[in-house]
UniProtKB/Swiss-Prot annotation:
Function description: Facilitative glucose transporter, which is responsible for constitutive or basal glucose uptake. Has a very broad substrate specificity; can transport a wide range of aldoses including both pentoses and hexoses. Most important energy carrier of the brain: present at the blood-brain barrier and assures the energy-independent, facilitative transport of glucose into the brain. In association with BSG and NXNL1, promotes retinal cone survival by increasing glucose uptake into photoreceptors. Required for mesendoderm differentiation.
Keywords: Acetylation, Cell membrane, Glycoprotein, Membrane, Phosphoprotein, Sugar transport, Transmembrane, Transmembrane helix, Transport
Membrane topology: Multi-pass membrane protein
Regions crossing the membrane: 12-33, 67-87, 91-112, 121-144, 156-176, 186-206, 272-293, 307-328, 335-355, 366-388, 402-422, 430-450
NCBIfam families to which the protein is assigned, alphabetical: SP
Modified residues (N-acetylmethionine): 1
Family as reported in the entry's similarity comment: Belongs to the major facilitator superfamily. Sugar transporter (TC 2.A.1.1) family. Glucose transporter subfamily.
PANTHER family: SOLUTE CARRIER FAMILY 2, SOLUTE CARRIER FAMILY 2, FACILITATED GLUCOSE TRANSPORTER MEMBER 1
Name this protein carries in UniProt: Solute carrier family 2, facilitated glucose transporter member 1
Residues that bear Phosphothreonine: 478
Tissue: Detected in osteoblastic cells (at protein level). Detected in brain, and at lower levels in kidney, heart and lung.
Length: 492
């Protein structure tokens, strides 16, 4: 390992910091819609009354509100599937810069929806910011992974998830009645997204383009070398360049990789399966059910001030993402993901017991709070941050954009399904709804144990070569890598 490989330079932190402002936008827009639900529904009612001279029917109101929440995920699906169209043509940094136009348009639509007496403006704004966030969930992990040195790739990749959870926490705090979650200021609450967009537009021109993109996609070796020297803080970047050139040579031997090719080619089939299942393990773990309906869950658990308990879970969320940031390069991705899944399954069982016995034993409300906080904490240890950046690690430069698009689409689709279905399933199953998530978590644990490789400390080309060859040479492996390094199938 080069001495500079663990060096954190100012230019590297500027690049990563500028990029993860997009992650913060994703988190903010995920969490912002929940707190002001009642005042926005009242706005819908007033608008309907203004147009038609009568109160809005309750079924129409429910439909409009569900659309306002769910349209964000629909936009995210479209955006995530379009990642490859932008990053290969315009580059990673320029794609992030261009997409801020969507954030500005969305801010204007949502900010002026009350003035324009138009709930259509709000819904369209939610759709557009959803497209922006879908693109961001592809751009940011890809860019951060490509500018980071191998030894710091996991830690810096976790900053994407940290940006998301900080965004959720800011949305929860800003959404309090006493701040912006009231009848007068909710348009500002939804449109404040123009601030991080503006800040990103100021910072990104000073950030370098991905050196991998410059060398492998554009064949601009001198520019790539110059960028690497600034990012690494050293004049000797020979090893980085050699690794990228080897990846480039491998890419030239491969034909252009389409999304269909990812599923057809034996070399890509296993990594794309891993990428998709890890994304599903994040969204189908039940975490979004907890965040979407945390206030109502705390109310059922008998908490007097549920909104503050929800903010408490947001603080736990942020704190344990920071913990993951410091341990991901020591413990490894696979290990943390397994710990997170197992811990969440245990907390889901506790939550079920607490909610089921709440009427007979009022003190169970305290157990439910502990279970929810534990559920959130274990999520941020592994299933929260790791699926985002491990997708970029599993693929070389050629198939990476297509793989990120497929994985992102899987994430957003499962997010949409949970958001739409949880309320109905919860009404059907009552306190036993989290048993469903427990079963899913156990299945994801089994899959991760047998199929997911450890990517810690390995270059992109080494990881991709492992899948191509069905396993690296035994002499190159650490004891940890010897144990299911590329899944059971690869060890035949």
């Amino acid at each position: 390992m080069e001495p500079s490989s663990k060096k954190v330079t100012g230019r590297l932190m500027l690049a990563v910091g500028g990029a993860v402002l997009g992650s913060l936008q994703f988190g903010y827009n995920t969490g912002v819609i929940n707190a002001p639900q009642k005042v926005i529904e009242e706005f819908y009612n007033q608008t309907w009354n203004h147009r038609y001279g009568e109160s809005i029917p309750s079924t129409t109101l429910t439909t409009l509100w569900s659309l306002s929440v769910a349209i964000f995920s629909v936009g995210g699906m479209i955006g995530s599937f379009s990642v490859g169209l932008f990053v290969n043509r315009f580059g990673r940094r320029n794609s992030m810069l261009m997409m801020n136009l969507l954030a500005f348009v969305s801010a204007v639509l949502m900010g002026f929806s009350k003035l324009g007496k138009s709930f259509e403006m709000l819904i369209l704004g939610r759709f557009i910011i959803g497209v922006y966030c879908g693109l961001t969930t592809g751009f940011v992990p890809m860019y951060v992974g490509e500018v980071s040195p191998t030894a710091l790739r996991g830690a810096l990749g976790t900053l994407h998830q940290l940006g998301i959870v900080v965004g959720i926490l800011i949305a929860q705090v800003f959404g309090l009645d006493s701040i912006m979650g009231n009848a007068d200021l909710w348009p500002l609450l939804l449109s404040v997204i123009f601030i991080p967009a503006l800040l990103q537009c100021i910072l990104l021109p000073f950030c370098p383009e991905s050196p991998r993109f410059l060398l492998i996609n554009r064949n601009e070796e001198n520019r790539a070398k110059s960028v690497l020297k600034k990012l690494r803080g050293t004049a000797d970047v020979t090893r980085d360049l050699q690794e990228m050139k080897e990846e480039g040579r491998q890419m030239m031997r491969e034909k252009k990789v389409t999304i269909l090719e990812l599923f057809r080619s034996p070399a890509y089939r296993q990594p794309i399966l891993i990428a998709v299942v890890l994304q599903l393990s994040q969204q189908l773990s039940g975490i979004n059910a907890v965040f979407y309906y945390s206030t109502s869950i705390f109310e059922k658990a008998g908490v007097q001030q549920p909104v503050y308990a929800t903010i408490g879970s947001g603080i736990v969320n942020t704190a344990f993402t920071v913990v993951s940031l410091f341990v991901v390069e020591r413990a490894g991705r696979r290990t943390l993901h397994l710990i997170g899944l197992a811990g969440m399954a245990g907390c889901a069982v506790l939550m079920t017991i607490a909610l089921a016995l709440l009427e007979q034993l009022p003190w169970m409300s305290y157990l439910s709070i502990v279970a929810i906080f534990g559920f959130v904490a274990f999520f941020e240890v592994g299933p929260g941050p790791i699926p985002w950046f491990i997708v970029a690690e599993l693929f070389s430069q050629g198939p990476r954009p297509a793989a990120v698009a497929v994985a992102g689409f899987s994430n957003w689709t499962s997010n949409f399904i949970v958001g739409m279905c949880f309320q109905y399933v919860e009404q059907l199953c009552g306190p036993y709804v989290f048993i469903i998530f427990t079963v899913l978590l156990v299945l994801f644990f089994i899959f991760t144990y047998f199929k997911v490789p450890e990517t810690k400390g390995r270059t992109f080309d080494e990881i991709a070569s492992g899948f191509r060859q069905g396993g690296a040479s035994q002499s190159d492996k650490t004891p940890e890598e010897l144990f299911h390094p590329l899944g059971a199938d690869s060890q035949v």
